[in-house]
């Protein structure tokens, strides 16, 4: 299985299919295979997929603590290095939840590497006004004893019995640090995005409320917003609709990549 050495850790990734490159960035507590399980078989028929496990997740190394640059900066640097090392850029970038934040951070860090953005179940900003309940949730998740036995079992299966608690604690600290910033904005430069951008949102999402995707849509010039009837994990809850929406978006903006 391929690994890429980045910022002192070994980053696991998978490659699937042939065609124009597409980077799939999973969300918190998932893996590339887990969160994109319904997309990889379909998208790989037309695209060269890069599906990494973000630092601290799955088969990528789990740092014991987050030191130096914050989590999002390190994870973004990992993705820039991975795409550059494979020589596959520019890439279409599809990010879910936390992965949508990393997708936009990748654009800000290296816009020449990004051909298009698909931002799924993300948020234009995170603050106490809109997401106060989420802030309290992430504070509680810093204590692994606060989560349900069912989720603990799932995390152990995905990330290892000895590593999932470190994952929770690290990401909890990273999110709380973001909340603590004065501007508390993940997509602080959304108005500067100039590549084709699709935003996909679950209409019943309580993790990232619809109003936040609407704000993001209003901030990104010429972006498109599609709201599907489901909760947070849109790629898994509405896989057929989601796949059709994404492929239609790419076909319209890049018709030469998939000539009929």
What are these regions (language model features)?
Residues 37, 41-44, 50-94:
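Active-site loop/oxyanion-hole signature of alpha/beta-hydrolase fold enzymes
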Residues 101-109, 114-148:
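Flexible "cap/lid" loop of the alpha/beta hydrolase fold
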Residues 28-40:
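The serine-hydrolase catalytic nucleophile loop
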Residues 203-208, 232-233:
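Acidic catalytic loop of the alpha/beta-hydrolase fold
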Residues 173-189:
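Active-site nucleophile elbow and catalytic-triad environment of alpha/beta-hydrolase enzymes
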Residues 19, 27-31, 97:
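Active-site glycine-rich loops that stabilize anionic/oxyanionic intermediates
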Residues 223-260:
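Catalytic active-site module of serine/aspartate enzymes centered on a nucleophile-bearing elbow/loop
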Residues 193, 199-201:
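Short beta-strand/loop motif that positions the catalytic acidic residue
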């Amino acid at each position: 299985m391929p690994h890429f050495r980045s910022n002192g850790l070994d980053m696991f990734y998978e490659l699937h299919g042939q065609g124009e490159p597409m980077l799939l960035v999973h969300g918190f507590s998932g893996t590339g295979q887990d969160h994109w399980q319904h997309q990889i078989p379909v998208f790989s028929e037309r695209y060269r997929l890069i599906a990494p496990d973000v630092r601290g997740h799955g088969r990528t190394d789990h740092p014991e603590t987050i030191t130096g640059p914050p989590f999002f900066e390190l994870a973004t640097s990992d993705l820039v290095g991975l795409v550059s090392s494979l020589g596959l850029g520019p890439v279409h970038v599809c990010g879910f939840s936390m992965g949508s934040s990393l997708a936009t951070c990748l654009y800000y860090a290296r816009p020449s590497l990004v051909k298009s953005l698909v931002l799924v179940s993300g948020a234009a900003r995170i603050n106490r006004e809109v997401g106060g309940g989420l802030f309290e949730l992430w504070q509680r998740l810093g204590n692994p004893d606060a989560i349900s036995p069912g989720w603990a079992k799932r995390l152990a299966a995905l990330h290892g019995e000895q590593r999932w608690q470190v994952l929770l604690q690290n990401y909890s600290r990273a999110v709380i640090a973001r909340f603590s910033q004065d501007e508390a904005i993940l997509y602080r430069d959304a108005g500067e995005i100039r590549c084709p951008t699709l935003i996909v949102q679950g209409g019943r999402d309580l993790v990232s409320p619809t109003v936040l995707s609407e704000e993001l849509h209003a901030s990104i010039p010429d972006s498109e917003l599609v709201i599907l009837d489901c909760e947070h994990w849109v790629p898994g809850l509405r896989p057929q609709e989601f796949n059709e929406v994404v492929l239609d978006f790419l076909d319209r903006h890049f018709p030469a990549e998939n000539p009929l």
